[in-house]
Amino acid sequence: MSLNILGKVAGILALTVGLAGCMDVTMEIDVQTETTGKATTTSVMGADVYAMIKAGAGSDDAGDDGFCKEAGATLTENADGSATCLLVVEGPFAELNDADAKDDGAKFEVVSPGVVKVSFTTEDMKGELGTEGQDEETKAMMQQFFEGHSITIRIKGKEILDTNMTKNGNSAEIVIPFLDLINGTVELPPALYATVKVN
């Protein structure tokens, strides 16, 4: 699990296109103390696409298809034919970011006793996902795959004190349509953040 959320969106899109389908992705950071948290990534692949992936793999073992292959991930096949991949990592903030995240991972800063600011840059998200250089057929295919699907980024704590995302009870989140990323029309501040109370 990585909190290198925005930097990894390009990878998510590349994987999704490679699977000839689309999914909805929710990435959540639950700040539990001044030094620890829980990161949860939930990816849902629609029934039609998941059926194609399984058929393409030549077996009922979805693990062969590349979807939900990350260490520690749990795959659930839903009654409607869709599939949900859940990955949870809990522990010190340093363990929530990939070792290779470098400057693109989530930043955790204790701003006062019991108050933590979580932030991450949006530059990678805005810079890597345009369709420049692609032919019209490829652009049309990507539009079809990703229409109606989105990535949700959520930060939780005991209380949200300040944020530039949408506040919803004890969480702050932003929902970004994949098409806005692909078309380069997404409007984001230089960084997304939420300041949360943890006690």
Model-derived segments and spans:
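Post-signal-peptide N-terminal segment of Sec-exported extracytoplasmic proteins
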Residues: 44-74
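Bacterial N-terminal signal peptides that target proteins for export
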Residues: 1-10
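C-terminal motif of bacterial Sec signal peptides marking the signal peptidase cleavage site
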Residues: 18-21
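Buried hydrophobic packing residues in well-ordered domains
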Residues: 27-29, 35, 153
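Post-signal peptide N-terminal segment of mature Sec-exported envelope proteins
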Residues: 31-47
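Residue-level signal for mature regions of secreted extracellular proteins and peptides
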Residues: 15, 60-62, 78
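Bacterial signal peptide processing site
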Residues: 23-25
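Mature, soluble, non-transmembrane domains
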Residues: 70, 74-199
